[in-house]
């Protein structure tokens, strides 16, 4: 069942009055509206949605990235129901799909945007709330370049360590003659061992 987004937004504003939130309407055929959350309030919003018994969004099924080099195109796809200032010089967006398995609700779609595509590309990690975000955030970091602050093991997951770019960005140009140089297997094992040793 589709969540009642206006009602959820009302609950969030009552509980987190300082949070910057906006209801984005989807003019497309799916009509799947979403909630735009300022990055600095993302973890608190996720924690509230997860922990509040009346909502109980206990499952994060999917996290994905979107590259918006031209903000006007983003505005055409997701129209703000309330006035929000356009973001200059493009941005990266992270999209979260939440479900309540107990109440059979979902997806509730959350969006968080970086300030730009070059220097201010940080979004807080939600791994502390939803463990299922761990690999998906790594994938977005690898392919889009979003840096998830507080992630327990933020490193490339698909491309090799020495790869310099982010191949899912819309301005990425694939070279036609580069040498594939994967990280040596022993080096990968050593990095993995350091990670698990630090956690234990």
Locate the predicted segments by residue:
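Terminal low-complexity/charged segments
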Residues: 1-200
């Amino acid at each position: 069942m589709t969540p009642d987004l206006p009602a959820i937004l009302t609950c969030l504003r009552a509980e987190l009055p300082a949070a910057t939130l906006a209801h984005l309407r989807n003019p497309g055929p799916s009509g799947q509206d979403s909630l735009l959350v300022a990055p600095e309030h993302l973890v608190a919003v996720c924690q509230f949605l997860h922990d509040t018994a009346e909502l109980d969004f206990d499952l994060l099924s999917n996290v994905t990235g979107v590259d918006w080099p031209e903000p006007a195109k983003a505005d055409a796809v997701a129209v703000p129901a309330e006035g929000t200032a356009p973001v200059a010089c493009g941005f990266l967006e992270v999209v979260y799909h939440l479900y309540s398995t107990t109440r059979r609700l979902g997806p509730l779609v959350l969006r968080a945007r970086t300030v730009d595509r070059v220097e201010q590309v940080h979004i807080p990690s939600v791994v502390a709330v939803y463990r299922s975000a761990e690999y998906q955030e790594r994938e977005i970091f690898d392919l889009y370049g979003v840096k998830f602050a507080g992630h327990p093991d933020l490193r490339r997951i698909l491309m090799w360590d020495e790869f310099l770019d982010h191949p899912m960005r819309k301005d990425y140009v694939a070279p036609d003659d580069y040498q594939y140089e994967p990280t040596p297997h022993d080096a990968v094992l050593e990095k993995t061992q350091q990670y698990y040793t630090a956690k234990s």
